[in-house]
Amino acid sequence: MTTLAPPAADSRAKPKQRPGDRWFSGTALFAGSMILVTLAAVAIFLIVQSIPGITATSENASVLTSTFWNYVWPLAFGTLWASLLALLMAVPLSVSVALFISHYAPRRLAQTLGYIVDLLAAVPSVVFGLWGILVLAPAVQPVYSWLVDNAGWFPLFAGPVSGTGRTIFTAAMVLAVMVTPIITAICREIFLQTPVLHEEAALALGATRWEMVRMAVFPFGRSGIVSASMLGLGRALGETMAVALVLSATGVITFELFTSVNPSTIPANIALTFPEAYGVNVNVLIATGLILFIVTFAVNALARWIVSRRKEFSGAN
């Protein structure tokens, strides 16, 4: 005769929640929801306040010469152009510095450089702006003159050259200096997370230090480099004071880097124009802020898409 044993308790039963667990879960849910609520509130405010500005003309808005789109297009171009130039300068430098700190520098030197990078990331933007207008612009102006005289046939180096050095390229260099610490700090942490077994396996197979970095470190950190670059691009897109101090803007569309006729950026234009704006002019400036909001949101969304596409090939899994 056999007896049936009572069924064992379901091992997948949920553990009993304590009051503290429920309180913490509710607090975390509330905090996460507030992020979405804040983002939605900002978007709604920008959309509602932008409608009068988008539909405005030169008849009821003194900042416009024709339509809103003719007004905002040079600003959007200047914002993207300056940020792209800054990113082209900052990313190679940041990756190189991060790689040196994480895999080449002695321990003490790496710690010192890491502290310096972290301190540079905390410097206020107005300090970078003052450095750009008082130190960098006068220093690079002779270089601009030489490039225009000897390589003026190249469209980007066409003249006439600016006599003050306050050009779109100078503003881009200041932006590059500002975003370099951010990109460097993130890339450094990504490189340090490379599995040691991957590095040791590459070296055991006879790879040199550079080959190990190229075959193990870079594939692992590729998505992190993209994320860091997009984060730096977001900082460059929204920078205000440094660009407003350095750039001598005239609100045109031009790819020339060294002339005194430079496109402005949306944040700098808002900062310089808003104190004297009134009526529909305020709505026009808010509408330009909406354009910047959309561009920044699109950049972040693109970064997340790129990271998700490359994640399975990064070696992180």
Where are these regions (language model features)?
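C-terminal transmembrane helix and the adjacent membrane-cytosol boundary/short C-terminal tail
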Residues: 188-192, 196, 203, 271-317
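Periplasmic/extracellular loop-to-transmembrane helix junction in inner-membrane transport proteins
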Residues: 9-27, 46-88, 106, 161, ...
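Hydrophobic alpha-helical transmembrane segments of multipass integral membrane proteins
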Residues: 73, 77, 81-89, 93, ...
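Transmembrane alpha-helical segments of polytopic membrane transport and secretion proteins
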Residues: 1-31, 303-317
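Glycine-rich helix-loop "coupling/hinge" segments at transmembrane-helix boundaries
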Residues: 235-279
